[in-house]
């Protein structure tokens, strides 16, 4: 169900609709493609328990009241019940419609034509305060329709949070801002603690999986630039597995990430969000995810979060506490 002008309307996955702001978008980001309609039975280790706790309902209420999107909802994250039940959420900035259409992602796609909510930075900061978060993850849709890709708006949100409480740790999982350094600088020049940009998959599968405007080395060069400009900021990336890659390609991707100074990497199982998206090619066992973690630590990452249900922002605060990283 999509809420449009205060009315709940059923919008079919893969179909076009008009947003409250007057522009067209595609539900779940990918048009109806029958050739992708392959259903693969999930193994038992991927089954999730629903937990509509008081904390879950509190987080839902706060984000709705402040007109905020969350990647938890828009990207159909399998961990939404667990995370929200623990009072944490990943806030998705600049609306719920992305200008890019990656073939794994269920976020709606379209052209927002420059629309932005000018109150969002303060609304996000107030929501973080109401949730009592000590560590917050911000992410956003890609906004190629904006001159700076939305970097200024993103930076204003980080600053608003830090102005409310400078002790709150902020992780910014950002777009690539088209690889333009002046845009990346806007994020670096805030008091952000962690900057993440997801590589998503191995080099060979980048264009079959990601939007053509994204790039394997564009992501790596983004992270390299961040580390060169601000060595004390932790850098992070994430890989999905199960899209047709080999373990050798995963290890090569780890090497490439380490070569540009990436500190933290996460690995999780790709799960097809709708029948229109890329099919799952394999389900990786929990034991193999443990092996990925072992290899990653041996390669020099400060931390490796690896497991079937791991997503880039999953338990982000606990990742750092576990290894006592100096935030």
Curated annotation (Swiss-Prot):
Residues 83-302 form the Radical SAM core domain. This is Lipoyl synthase. Keywords: 4Fe-4S, Cytoplasm, Iron, Iron-sulfur, Metal-binding, S-adenosyl-L-methionine, Transferase. [4Fe-4S] cluster 2 binds at residues 98, 102, 105. Pfam families: LIAS_N, Radical_SAM. Disulfide bonds: none annotated. The keyword Iron applies. PANTHER family: LIPOYL SYNTHASE, LIPOYL SYNTHASE, MITOCHONDRIAL. Gene3D superfamilies: Aldolase class I. [4Fe-4S] cluster 1 binds at residues 72, 77, 83, 313. The gene is lipA. Binds 2 [4Fe-4S] clusters per subunit. One cluster is coordinated with 3 cysteines and an exchangeable S-adenosyl-L-methionine. It is found in: Cytoplasm. SMART domains: Elp3 (SM00729). Its EC number is 2.8.1.8. GO terms for molecular function: 4 iron, 4 sulfur cluster binding; lipoate synthase activity; metal ion binding. It comes from the Bacteria. Belongs to the radical SAM superfamily. Lipoyl synthase family. GO terms for cellular component: cytoplasm. It catalyses: [[Fe-S] cluster scaffold protein carrying a second [4Fe-4S](2+) cluster] + N(6)-octanoyl-L-lysyl-[protein] + 2 oxidized [2Fe-2S]-[ferredoxin] + 2 S-adenosyl-L-methionine + 4 H(+) = [[Fe-S] cluster scaffold protein] + N(6)-[(R)-dihydrolipoyl]-L-lysyl-[protein] + 4 Fe(3+) + 2 hydrogen sulfide + 2 5'-deoxyadenosine + 2 L-methionine + 2 reduced [2Fe-2S]-[ferredoxin]. It is an enzyme of class 2 (transferase).
